[in-house]
C-alpha cells in the first residue's frame, strides 16, 4: 500500500519540502532506494548519498537539509528533528499494513488449564501450555510452543514468539515483546556452601537455595531471543518500563534494570545488581553482582564492571583489536612489567645514593 507524503505527515508529523503528493510504498537505504521508496538520513556523513539517491523522498533533519543547499532542488523531503525515529514508526506502519491480524482463538493442540483465564481476544498458537491461575489479557499473542507457568500474568497486547517460556508467579506488563527461546523466571543461581575440611579431605556439597521470588516486567519491554531472566531469591527480579534487551543476555536473580535502559547481546549481569534509568550496556559486557550503576551510565562492549558506578558517563575496560604482532609485543611488555618496575626502583635507589635526582 502506497501513501502520499501528505498522509505520512498527517500521521507522524514533520514538514514537507517538495511534492506532497509523492507516493511511497516502502523504505530502503539511500544508496538502494527507488522512486517508490522512502529513505532517511540519520548520519550527516552520508549527506552526499542524498544528492545521488533515487528515493522518492528522504527523511531529513532541518540542519542537514540546509547543508544540501541547491542540491535539494527537485527532491522530496519530510523534515523532522529525528529522522531515525520517524523511519522506525513508518516502518512499523508498513509492516502492520502488510500483515493481517491473526484471528483470536485457541489452537486445538494448545493445553490450557481450566483454572487459567484467557481473554477472548487472545491468540493462542499450536502446542501452547498455560497452567492454572495464569491470566492472559486482551490481545495477547502466544506463538507455537510457548509455556506460561501457574499464576503468571501476561499483559494486554504482548507477543511471545515460538518456544518462549515464562515460569510460575511472574508478571509481564502490557505490550511486551518476547522473542523465541527466551526464558523468564528460571531459578536464580543460588547455592549455600556446606563443606568441611580442606584439600583432599574436604567433604560436603552445595545446598540449593530455593528461589521463591518472581520476575516483574514493566510496560513496553522487549526481550531478545534466548535471553534468560532469573527469578528472585526472595523478592522479584524487576525489569522496568521500556527496557530493551538484545539476544542471549543473562540477567541474574534480584537484579533491577531501570526504565529505558538498553542491553546489547551476550551481556551478563550477575545477581542483585541495580542498573539505573537510560543506561546503555554494550555487547558482551560483564557486570558483577551486588553493584549499582547510576542513571545514564554507558558501559562499552566487552567491558568488565566490578564495582558500583554511581556517576553518569562512559566507562570502558575492553582492549580494542590490534594487529596480531603488535598485540604479542604489548602482551610481552605486560608480562615483564614487574621486572621493569624493579629495575626502575633499583636505578632510582642508585641515583639517590649518588646524590642524583629523579622525577
UniProtKB/Swiss-Prot annotation:
Protein name: UDP-3-O-acylglucosamine N-acyltransferase
Any one of the GO BP annotations: lipid A biosynthetic process
Keyword terms, alphabetized: Acyltransferase, Lipid A biosynthesis, Lipid biosynthesis, Lipid metabolism, Repeat, Transferase
PROSITE patterns, per database record: HEXAPEP_TRANSFERASES
Family: Belongs to the transferase hexapeptide repeat family. LpxD subfamily.
Gene Ontology MF terms: N-acyltransferase activity
Lineage top rank: taxon: Bacteria
CDD domains, per the entry: LbH_LpxD
Cited function: Catalyzes the N-acylation of UDP-3-O-acylglucosamine using 3-hydroxyacyl-ACP as the acyl donor. Is involved in the biosynthesis of lipid A, a phosphorylated glycolipid that anchors the lipopolysaccharide to the outer membrane of the cell.
Active-site residue list: 253
Originating species: Burkholderia cenocepacia (strain ATCC BAA-245 / DSM 16553 / LMG 16656 / NCTC 13227 / J2315 / CF5610)
Assembly information from the UniProt record: Homotrimer.
SUPFAM superfamilies: Trimeric LpxA-like enzymes
Reactions listed under catalytic activity: a UDP-3-O-[(3R)-3-hydroxyacyl]-alpha-D-glucosamine + a (3R)-hydroxyacyl-[ACP] = a UDP-2-N,3-O-bis[(3R)-3-hydroxyacyl]-alpha-D-glucosamine + holo-[ACP] + H(+)
Encoding gene (name): lpxD
Amino acid at each position: 500500500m502506497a501513501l502520499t507524503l501528505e498522509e505520512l505527515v498527517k500521521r507522524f508529523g514533520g514538514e514537507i519540502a517538495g511534492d506532497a503528493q509523492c507516493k511511497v510504498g516502502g523504505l530502503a537505504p539511500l544508496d538502494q532506494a527507488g522512486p517508490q521508496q522512502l529513505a532517511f538520513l540519520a548520519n550527516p556523513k552520508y549527506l552526499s548519498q542524498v544528492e545521488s539517491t533515487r528515493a522518492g523522498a528522504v527523511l531529513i533533519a532541518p540542519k542537514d537539509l540546509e547543508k544540501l543547499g541547491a542540491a535539494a532542488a527537485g527532491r522530496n523531503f519530510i523534515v523532522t528533528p529525528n529522522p531515525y525515529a520517524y523511519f522506525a514508526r513508518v516502518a512499523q506502519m508498513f509492516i502492520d499494513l502488510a500483515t493481517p491480524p491473526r484471528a483470536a482463538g485457541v489452537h486445538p493442540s494448545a493445553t490450557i488449564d481450566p483454572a487459567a483465564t484467557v481473554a477472548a481476544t487472545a491468540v493462542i498458537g499450536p502446542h501452547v501450555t498455560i497452567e492454572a491461575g495464569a491470566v492472559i489479557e486482551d490481545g495477547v499473542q502466544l506463538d507455537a510452543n510457548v509455556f506460561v507457568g501457574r499464576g503468571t500474568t501476561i499483559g494486554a497486547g504482548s507477543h511471545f514468539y515460538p518456544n518462549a517460556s515464562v515460569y510460575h508467579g511472574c508478571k509481564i506488563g502490557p505490550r511486551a515483546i518476547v522473542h523465541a527461546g527466551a526464558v523468564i523466571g528460571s531459578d536464580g543461581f543460588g547455592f549455600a556452601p556446606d563443606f568441611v575440611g580442606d584439600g583432599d579431605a574436604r567433604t560436603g556439597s552445595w545446598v540449593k537455595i530455593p528461589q521463591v521470588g518472581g520476575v516483574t516486567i514493566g510496560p513496553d519491554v522487549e526481550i531478545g531471543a534466548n535471553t534468560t531472566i532469573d527469578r528472585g531469591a526472595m523478592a522479584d527480579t524487576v525489569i522496568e518500563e521500556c527496557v530493551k534487551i538484545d539476544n542471549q543476555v543473562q540477567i541474574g536473580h534480584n537484579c533491577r534494570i531501570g526504565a529505558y535502559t538498553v542491553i546489547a547481546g551476550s551481556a551478563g549481569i550477575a545477581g542483585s545488581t541495580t542498573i539505573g534509568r537510560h543506561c546503555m550496556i554494550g555487547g558482551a559486557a560483564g557486570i558483577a553482582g551486588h553493584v549499582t550503576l547510576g542513571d545514564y551510565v554507558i558501559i562499552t562492549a566487552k567491558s568488565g564492571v566490578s564495582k558500583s558506578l554511581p556517576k553518569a558517563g562512559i566507562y570502558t575496560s575492553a582492549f580494542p583489536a590490534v594487529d596480531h604482532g603488535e598485540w604479542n609485543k604489548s602482551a610481552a611488555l605486560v608480562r615483564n612489567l614487574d621486572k621493569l618496575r624493579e629495575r626502575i626502583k633499583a636505578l632510582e635507589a642508585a641515583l639517590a645514593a649518588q646524590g642524583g635526582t629523579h622525577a
